[in-house]
Curated annotation (Swiss-Prot):
It comes from the Eukaryota. WD repeats lie at residues 171-210, 220-261, 264-301, 305-342, 344-381, 387-424, 427-458. Interacts with SKP1 and CUL1. InterPro entries: F-box-like_dom_sf (IPR036047), F-box_dom (IPR001810), G-protein_beta_WD-40_rep (IPR020472), WD40/YVTN_repeat-like_dom_sf (IPR015943), WD40_repeat_CS (IPR019775), WD40_repeat_dom_sf (IPR036322), WD40_rpt (IPR001680). This is F-box/WD repeat-containing protein 9. Keywords: Acetylation, Phosphoprotein, Repeat, Ubl conjugation pathway, WD repeat. It comes from Homo sapiens. The modification Phosphothreonine is found at T55. Substrate-recognition component of the SCF (SKP1-CUL1-F-box protein)-type E3 ubiquitin ligase complex. Residues 1-30, 42-64 are annotated as: Disordered. GO terms for cellular component: cytosol. Pfam families: F-box-like, WD40. Residues 76-123 form the F-box domain.
């Protein structure tokens, strides 16, 4: 799929031009949505897989610059009398953290040797054996990237042989469609079609008490929401949940999960983004709405940016990015209060993960797409087939790791290279919805009424 570049001169003011939404049954609306949006391509209508775009990427080659020789000459025989190339070869067998944080403190000569960014670039490219990163960055932190890559490869070595797996099947009585890790992976929230948001203590996994489920948010007499819980987002110790009942509820984890606010949206809330100064919702009635969570929360602005439901969104201090069933990706400039770009796609995006300047997204055809933020404009640079045969429902990207989930009943673990290298695939009895990774925990929601958890080596 080749996606055209969006223009960066769409300066229309972000004013409300919404149409009123008629009253509908949220359960019937949700079921119709799932059947339409998350179902696999129909037989005989298979989508063509795109050839990768020709944007150049970094790759290990013969022309790669050699690490600078900075080891001072010594008169006495010993380790430092070895050639720099041999010292670097020895270092390649040591953990990257040890080399960077311990070996560099031994002496000035070793500090100079391991402080050269070319040293770390060569080491990273040898580890991944593919072009990396997918989007070139001028001031890329090669030591940090190398540490993250090596940790990821070590944790999932031998097809994830050393990874602990837990299936938390008691707590929900319907499909789990949203997950969120908190406090470095110590706690987890899960939202389900049973209308509840559950709080889990993942520190109790594998213990004798096994008291993993802490509580269900809300009052005991009622469920958390009156409709399916479809989205979760957090800002520090505060959490919000979005539902097909057209509400967003706010919860304070520092106060034992007590509710401290509620927003009545115009339609079913399908996606959320929570920042210190704004809370953004994407709804079934095609709107993107901004609230100030510090005041009320108070409605700031809203607009119908799309012609179909808003399926995924994210925000930072400069942009609000939304993807819709209408096959568009819209970028709003927060500071100029205007639409910056409107990209027309050949498929619709279901999930996104952003670490500037890379935006990774999964679509309804089972494909991954990478957009680069270049001087404020997002450009599609690569499209990948990573083996998913059905829609990609969850994605999480970081500089050293990439996770994807799909209704094809798999979670796939990748290295974020060009193309991504899949190092582990775990299959399940039902479709997987959303994925979240933090610390040494990875979680995914399952259509099998369970929360799936993988605990990695610390």
């Amino acid at each position: 799929m080749e996606l055209p570049l969006g223009r960066c001169d769409d300066s229309r003011t972000w004013d409300d031009d919404s149409d009123p939404e008629s009253e509908t049954d949220p359960d019937a609306q949700a079921k119709a949505y799932v059947a339409r949006v998350l179902s696999p391509p129909k037989s005989g209508l298979a989508f063509s897989r795109p050839s990768q775009l020709s944007t150049p990427a970094a790759s290990p080659s013969a022309s790669e610059p050699r690490a600078a020789s900075r080891v001072s000459a010594v008169s006495e025989p010993g380790l430092l009398s070895l050639p720099p190339e041999l010292l670097l070869e020895i270092c390649s067998y040591l953990d990257a953290r040890l080399v960077l944080h311990v070996l560099s403190r031994v002496c000035h000569a070793l500090r100079d040797l391991v402080s050269d960014h070319v040293t770390w670039r060569l080491r990273a490219l040898r580890r991944v054996r593919a072009p990396y990163p997918v989007v070139e960055e001028k001031n890329f932190d090669w030591p940090a990237a190398c540490i993250a890559l090596e940790q990821h490869l070590s944790r999932w070595a031998e097809d994830g042989r050393w990874v602990e797996y837990f299936c938390l099947a008691e707590g929900h009585v319907a499909s789990v469609d949203s997950v969120l890790l908190l406090q470095g992976g110590s706690l987890c929230l899960s939202g389900s079609r049973d209308r509840n948001v559950n709080l889990w203590d993942l520190r109790q996994l594998g213990t004798e008490s096994n008291q993993v489920l802490i509580k269900t948010l809300g009052t005991k007499r009622n469920s958390t929401h009156e409709g399916w819980v479809w989205s979760l987002a957090a800002q520090d110790h505060r959490v919000c949940s979005g539902s097909w009942d057209s509400t967003v509820k706010l919860w304070d984890m520092a106060a034992d999960g007590q509710q401290f606010g509620e927003i009545k949206a115009s339609s079913a809330v399908l996606c959320l983004s929570y920042l210190p100064d704004i809370l953004v919702t994407g709804t079934y009635d095609k709107k993107v709405t901004i609230y100030d969570p510090r005041a009320g929360p108070a409605l700031l602005k809203h607009q119908q940016l799309h012609s179909r439901p808003v399926l995924t969104l994210l925000a930072d201090d400069r942009h609000i990015i939304s993807g819709s069933e209408d096959h568009t990706l819209v970028v709003v400039d927060r500071r100029a209060n205007s639409v910056l770009q409107r990209l027309q796609l050949d498929s619709y995006l279901l999930c996104m993960s952003y670490q500037e300047p890379q935006l990774w997204a999964g679509d309804n055809q089972g494909l991954l797409h990478v957009f680069a933020n270049r001087n404020g404009c997002f450009q599609l640079i690569r499209s990948f087939d990573v083996g998913h045969s059905f829609p990609i429902t969850g994605i999480q990207y970081s500089v050293g790791a990439l996770y994807t989930t799909s209704t094809d009943k798999t979670i796939r673990v990748h290295v974020p290279t060009d193309p991504p290298r899949t190092i582990c695939t775990r299959r399940h009895d039902n479709g997987l919805n959303r994925v979240c990774a933090e610390g040494n925990l990875v979680v995914a929601g399952s259509g099998d009424l369970s929360l799936e958890v993988w605990r990695l080596q610390a």
